[in-house]
Design a protein with these regions (language model features):
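Post-transcriptional modification and biogenesis factors for structured RNAs
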Residues: 1-144
Length: 144
């Protein structure tokens, strides 16, 4: 199941964030990391240091100049956003996402996360099939 998923970080601002993402991915058996327009030079020592044992994910990460190229590697894009958006994209819950995974087994799925400070733009979201909202604390909604 893990090989079906790739993680797309759009305009990450900190090497530490990329490293923490790689480490979390490795904890759960994921290994496909795609990075769009990193705001820092990548790979860098901070990303590697924060990834601890996930150097393989950092070293194999693919870097893209734009979202369109990054998402072209997948046939389903699910964006994660803490904010509800007024755009023509279906917002889904975790339960909805589970149903999609069960009904469409042969998908190559990209999970897209936005920049740390601002989240995904509406333009970034336009490349998504769905927007997934994971329940979080009302006081701190950011997942990235």
């Amino acid at each position: 199941m893990q090989n079906k998923f790739g993680f797309i970080l759009v305009k990450p601002q900190l090497g530490e964030n990329i490293g923490a993402c790689a480490r979390s991915m490795k904890n759960f058996g994921f290994n496909k990391l795609h990075i769009v327009e990193p705001k820092i030079n990548f790979p860098n020592h901070k990303a590697k240091a924060t990834s601890v044992g996930a150097y393989d994910i950092i070293n194999k990460a693919k870097v893209y100049n734009n979202v369109e190229n990054a998402v072209s590697k997948f046939n389903l894009i699910v964006s994660l956003s803490a904010r509800r958006r007024d755009i023509n994209k279906k917002h889904i819950s975790l339960q909805d996402f589970q149903k999609i995974l069960t009904s469409k087994r042969n998908l190559n799925i990209g999970l897209m996360f936005g920049p740390e400070a601002s989240g995904l733009s509406n333009k970034d979201l336009s490349f998504s099939n769905y927007i997934l909202q994971i329940p979080t604390s009302a006081k701190f909604k950011s997942l990235n």
